[in-house]
Amino acid sequence: MEQGEASPPVPAEHEAKCDTSNNEEEGELFDFDSGDEVPEADRQVPSADDRTRGAEAGGADENTCPAGNGTGAEPAPEAEPAKLVVPTKVNPYSVIDITPLQEDQPSSPDANTEEEGVGLRVPSGYSVPVPCGYAVPSNLPLLLPAYSSPVIIRAESVEEEEAAETVGDGQCNSLSSEDLPHSSEQGSQEGSALARWAADPANTAWMENPEEAIYDDVPRENSDSEPDEMIYDDVENGEEGGNSSPEYGWSSSEFESYEEPSDSEGKNGIPRSFLRSSHKKQLSHDLTRFKAHCEEKMRGLVASTVGAMEIQQAKQRQERKMQKLMKAAKEGTKDGLEKTKAAVKRGGSFIRTRSLVSQDHRCYFEEEQNLFIDVDCKHPEAVLTPMPEGLSQQQVVRRYILGSIVESEKNYVDALRRILEQYEKPLSEMEPRLLSDRKLRMVFYRVKEILQCHSMFQIALASRVSEWDVVETIGDVFVASFSKSMVLDAYSEYVNNFSTAVAVLKKTCATKPAFLEFLKLSQDSSPDRVTLHSLMMRPIQRFPQFILLLQDMLKNTAKGHPDRLPLQMALTELETLAEKLNERKRDADQRCEIKQIAKAINERYLNKLLSSGNRYLVRSDDVIETVYNDRGEIVKTKQRRIFMLNDVLMCATASSRNSHESHAVMSQRYLLKWSVPLGHVDVIQYNGGSGAGEHCRHHAAHSPESLAVVANAKPHKVYMGPGQLYQDLQNLLHDLNVVGQISQLIGNLRGSYQNLNQSVAHDWTSGLQRLILRKEDAIRAADRCRIQLQLPGKQDKSGRPTFFTAVFNTLTPAIKESWVSSLQMAKLALEEENHMGWFCVDDDGNLAKKETHPLLVGHMPVMVAKQPEFKIECAAYNPEPYLSNESQPASPSTARGFLWIGSCSNQMGQVAIVSFQGSNPKVIECFNVESRILCMVYIPAEESKPQETTETKDPEATASRAPHVPTICLGTEEGSISIYKSSQGCKKVRLQHFYAPDKSTVMSLACSPQGLYAGLVNGSVASYTKAPDGSWNSEPQQVIKLGVLPVRSLLLVEGALWAASGGQVFMASVETHTIENQLEAHQDEGMVISHMAVAGVGIWIAFTSGSTLRLFHTETLKHLQDVNIDAPVHSMLPGHQRLSVTSLLVCHGLLMVGTSLGVVVALPVPRLQGIPKVTGRGMVSYHAHNGPVKFIVSATAFQNKDRARDSPRSGSELQDEDPKDLLCSEEGPSCPGQPDTYTSVWLGDSLGLPTQKNDLSSSSGSLNLSHGSSSLEHRSVDSSLCDLLRDPSASPRSRPQGSRRARASSALVVCGGQGHRRVHRKARQPSQEDLVSSVMVWQIPLLGM
C-alpha cells in the first residue's frame, strides 16, 4: 500500500458544510468560555461517532445491537468494571464513552439476550466495541479513544454560512437513514465472515503469546517509540495545526509500519488482514471485504477525532458549571430554580458529539420547545365591557388608557404571529429552500418564546379586563407577567441577535432574488403592507411603549387608589427589565462592532490589535476634517469617520464597495489615516480649559501663537478660523481702549470743532461695541461644532516628541458636546486610579468589572491652610444657572456651581468654598465662624417678576436683596442660624444671623418656597417665614413639638415635611404645621434614624447603628425592602469592624451610601418615578477616607427658567434692546435671567472705561449703547463674516421646534471626609496630610439615560 493511502480520506465537502445548515443549538445560551466566536482555524469537524452512527446499524456492530436501533441508544461500555444498564432513552447529544470492553466485565442480561438474538458469539479473549467494529485483544493495555471529544457549538458567521450554501442548501447527510437497509445486509455478511474466521483454531494460535503482538492501529500504553512526524492533519486546530505533534493526536508511528513486513507478527500468526500490510494471502472474499470496510471506517474515525484529554476537560468544565448552577438554585427563588433547570437542559446540548442524523435534531427541537409553555390554545380575547354610567372623569380616562393597552397588546401579538406564520413557516416548508435551517433560526431566534410570554400575559390581561369595573387594577398583572426570568432571557437573546438577523436578511436579499421576491409578495399580501423589518422591530420597541402607557395610567390614578402602588411597582419592574436589556445589548454590540471595524480596516497589524484584549467601541462619528495651509487658509475639507475606542482614537476614510455585481449591496471599508492612544489626545479650546465650555471667561489676552490653527504655524502669519476671529476680537478691544482714551482727550479740548466732539467719540465707541458683540457671536458659532485635537506625531531627528493638529467639524453642536464629554470619560477611565476603582462580585462570587461605575476625577484638601484639627461635618451645593438651548446639553454633565463645606474643631467652625467653574475644582475662599457647624442647606433665589425687573434701577440694591440671590443657611451648635450670600465672584457676605428658640442646637435644616425649617436637639422643628423685604423673620412662625430626641434629618416630600426623631418619622403639613401621619421605621429599641433620602415614591432610611437600610413607600408608608451593606464591605475589607451609615444620596440610578469605615457603597436603583428598590449587587469603592464619609452631594447644574424657552439672541438683536435691560448686577451671569451665553468675552486688559467692572461680569452689562449712530465703516465686512459663521440654531426662525438637545453623558458626585487612602495597598501610619479634610469628586457615566 502507498504512503498516501495510509492517510484517512478528507470528509466530503458537502458533508462538512451541510452541517452548518442543520438545526443545532447556537453557542450563545450556555457558553463555557469567553463567549466570543471561535476562530475559523479552531473549528472542529463533526465527531466520528456521529458521522458513523447511521452506518453502525449495518456494520460489524450490528451483531451486538437489536435491529432498528440505529440511533446509538446502546449504552457505551465503560473502562472500569461496572454493571451495564441499558437505558430506555438516551439523549442523542450527550457524550458517549466508547472505551473498549474488558473480558472480565460482568455482562448484563440484556446484552446476553441481544447476542443470542443475533446469533453471533464472540470468541473468548475478544470484545467488539460498539463504535469501531474491529476486534481487540482483551488483555492489551487500555487507551482512551480519541474520537469522542466534545464539540463546542458556536454560531457561524454569515460569511461561513454563505460559503456553506454555495455547495448546496439542504443537502442530505451521506450517512442518512436511507442507507441503513444496504448497510444492514452488508454487515450481516461481514459478521458471518468474522464468525467463521474466529472459529478456526489456527487463526487464534497467536493469542497464546499476546505480549509479542500488538496491533499497529492500537498503540501500546507503555510504548517508548518516538514518532518523528504526523501524517494526519491536526483536526482539532484546523489549518493552524500544520506543525502538529503527537500530543495533539495520532502519530505517524501508529500507521507507517503498515508498509513493512513484520516477521514476528507473521510467526505468531497475527492475521495480516488486520495489519494493513501489502502482503497478499489467500483470504476469503468476505474477509477481504470486511477488512476493507474496517480500514475505511477507521480512516474516517481517525480523521475526525481529537485528543482524549479534551473530553475529560470538557466533562470537568460541565461538572463545575453544574455545581455553580445548583448552588445558585438552592440560594435563589423558585423562579431561579426553574431557570436553572432550563439552563441545565440547554447545557446538555453543548457538550456533546455533533450528530448528523436528522432525528437528533428533531429531538433537540422538542427539547428546546419544552422549555416554554405552549399557550397556543384558544382563550378569550381581552375585550372591555360597555362603559357603565356614573363614572368620574378619572375613571373614564383610565378606561381609555386600558383600552389602549389592550389594543396595543393585541396588535403586538398579531405582529409576532405574522412573523411566524407569514414568514418563518413558508420559508421552512418551501422547496427549494431559500434559507437553511440554521439561517432560519438566526433570523427568527426567540420569536416564538416572546410570543408565548405575551400569550400568557394576554390571558391574564383578558381575565382582568373582564372584571375591570369591579377591581380597577392593572399594575399587578404587569408585575406578575414581566418579573419572570424567562421574559428577560427571551427578550435579551432576541435583542442581542437582532443585528445578526438583519444582516442575514440583507445579504440573502442581495444574493437570492427569489428571497427578495418572497419578501415583496408577503408585504404586498398584508393589509397594512408592513415590512418584515418593521415587524421585527416591534419587540425592541415594546417595553418603552409599556412604560409610556403605564405612566399615563399612573398620572390618572389618585393617591390612595388600590392600583397606584401596583402601577408604581410595575413601572419599576419594566424599567429594570429595560435597563438590563440595554446593558446586555450594549455589551453585545460593543463586541460585535469592534470585530466589524477590525474586519473593515485594511491594516493587518491594527486588525490584530483590535481583535485582542478587552477593547470595545465607545462611539463612532462622521465628521468633516478641515485642512489649512501656512497662511491659515482652508486648503480642503474631507469627510472622515472617527472611532473612539476605550483606549485608542482612530481616524479613517470610509468607502463603500459593491459586494455583488448584480445587486447594489454596499459594504463599508475603511482606509486608516492615523491611530493614537486615547490618553495622548488633547482637545484645544480657545475660550477656556477642558470642560469649561463657553461659560468660562478670561481676563488675560490670548497670544496669536495660541490661537493658531496649525500647530507649527508662525506667529506673524494671519490665520482663519477661530484663531483669526480671536485675533480680530483682540484688535477691536485694543481699538476700543484707544477710542476711550481719545474720548477723554477730546473732553480736554478748549475749542469747539464740527467733527471732533464728545458726540462723535461716543458714536465711535458705540460702533466698536457693536462690532465686538458680532465678533463674539461669530466665535461662538464657529466653536459650537469645531473640535480641534492635538495629537502626538513621530519623533524628530533629535528624538524629541512632535505634535500635529487635526480640526474637525461635527454636524451639530450637540454632537460636539457629547463627543468631548465621551472623550473626557474615556480618558478618565484609563487613569491609574480608576483601573481598580470599585469592588464588585457577581452571583458566583467572582470579581465583575462594570463599565458604568463612578470614575474618580480626583481628591483634594479643602482647607487653605492644612489644619487637621478641623474635621468635615456637612456640605451644601449651590448650582449656577445655565441656559437651556440646543447648543449645550441640558444636563449636569459639567458642574458650574460652588460647594460650601462646613468643618468643625472643638470650639469653632470653618467654611471652605470650592468652585467648579473651571476644568479643575479649587478652593476660592475659606473663613471661620463663631461656633461649630452641624448642618447647612442651599436656598435658591426667588424668581423675580418681569415688572420688578424693569422697575429696578439700582443693580446694587437688587443684589443685596435676599430673594433675588442664592444663599446658604448654616446651623450651628450654639443654636444660631446664619444666612450667607452665595454667588459667582462674591466674597464672604453674611446677610442675617439669628438664634433658634431657647438657643437649641440646630441639628438639621430644610427649605421650601414657603419657609425655612430647623430641626432642633430638643425634638422640635422651628418654621420660619419671609418678611416683606425678602429677608427671613428672626422669630419662628411655628414650633412643632415631635418628641424629646434630636431631629437629625429633615426632608420635603411632595409638600410635606418629613422629620426624623429617634426611630420615628413624622409627616407635617407645611401649610398648617400639624402632624398628619407618622412612621415607625424600626421596631427594635434604640434604633435612631440618622439619614433619609427620597427618590420617586420611595424613601430610604438609615440608622445611627447597624448597616441596614430600609425602603418605605412614601404614599402608603409600607415597608418594601431591606438592604444590608455589611456583606459587600467586609468582603473587601480585612477583619470585621463595626459598620454604620454616615451619609446617604440617591441620584442617577445609584443609591450611594457613605460608611463609618471611609468607603462608599453604590447600589443600583431605577431612575423613573417608580419605587427606588435595589435591583442588583452593590459596588464598594477602593478609594476611601481615613474616617467616616461625612457627606455625599450631587453637583448638578439647574436650568435657567427665565430664559429656558427663549432662543439665543444675536448681536443685532441685542443692539436694539433698551440699555437699562442690558445692565447687570455685580453678580454678572449668576443673576436670574441673565443670559451669559449672549454676553461678550473680555479677553484684553482693563479698558479703563467708566462702565467696565473688575469682577467677572459680562461685557454686555457694561455697554451703554448709543442709538442713531451710522458711522460703522466695517459693518458690512464683519456682518457678512458673522452671517457665515453664526450657528443656524441661534436664529429662532431657522431652528425647528422639535430639535433635540444634547444628552448628558455623566454627572458629578462629591463626598467628603478626612484625608484619602487606597484600600488594599500597603498599610502605613497616616501622616498629618492624610488627616486633613478632603473631598473626592466622582463622575458617574449615564449610559442608560
Curated annotation (Swiss-Prot):
Compositional bias (Polar residues)? 102-111, 171-191
Q: Which residues carry this modification: Phosphoserine?
A: S157, S355, S1262
Disordered: annotated span: 1-84, 99-120, 158-195, 207-273, 1202-1237, 1253-1306
List the Gene3D superfamilies hit by this protein, alphabetically. Answer: Dbl homology (DH) domain (1.20.900.10), YVTN repeat-like/Quinoprotein amine dehydrogenase (2.130.10.10)
Q: In which tissues is it expressed?
A: Ubiquitously expressed.
- GO molecular function list: guanyl-nucleotide exchange factor activity; kinesin binding
- Leader sequence residues: none
What UniProt keywords apply to this chain's record, in alphabetical order? Coiled coil, Guanine-nucleotide releasing factor, Methylation, Phosphoprotein
- Briefly state the protein's biological role: May play a role in developmental myelination of peripheral nerves.
Q: What is the protein's given name? A: Rho guanine nucleotide exchange factor 10
**Organism from which the protein derives:** Mus musculus (Mouse)
Q: Source organism lineage? A: Eukaryota, Metazoa, Chordata, Craniata, Vertebrata
Q: Which gene encodes it?
A: Arhgef10
